[in-house]
């Protein structure tokens, strides 16, 4: 259960997990932009799978902070 209530914006209701998803997506974009110049993607076997796992880990960390 999250600490945040359901948000209603212009008649649309958004569950608290929606904002956690958006926040983790913003952090994911930032981390991906920081990792790209380092050349870490040269050592990754499957970049799309790596990005998916990175996003899942970030989402888990963000969601654990708000519980």
Curated annotation (Swiss-Prot):
One Pfam family named in its UniProt record: DUF1656
One GO term describing the cellular component: plasma membrane
Main location: membrane
TM helices/strands, residue ranges: 3-23, 43-63
Entry coiled-coil feature ranges: none
InterPro entries for this protein: DUF1656
Subcellular location: Cell membrane
Domain of life: Bacteria
The entry's keywords: Cell membrane, Membrane, Transmembrane, Transmembrane helix
Membrane topology according to the record: Multi-pass membrane protein
NCBIfam families: PRK11594.1
Entry similarity comment: Belongs to the AaeX family.
Protein name (record): Protein AaeX
């Amino acid at each position: 259960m999250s600490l945040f209530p359901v948000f209603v914006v212009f008649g649309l209701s958004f569950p608290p997990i929606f904002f956690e998803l958006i926040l983790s997506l913003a952090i994911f974009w930032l981390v991906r932009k920081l990792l790209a110049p380092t050349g870490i993607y040269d050592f990754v076997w499957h970049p799309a799978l790596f990005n998916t796992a990175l996003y899942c880990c970030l989402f888990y960390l963000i969601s654990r902070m708000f519980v």
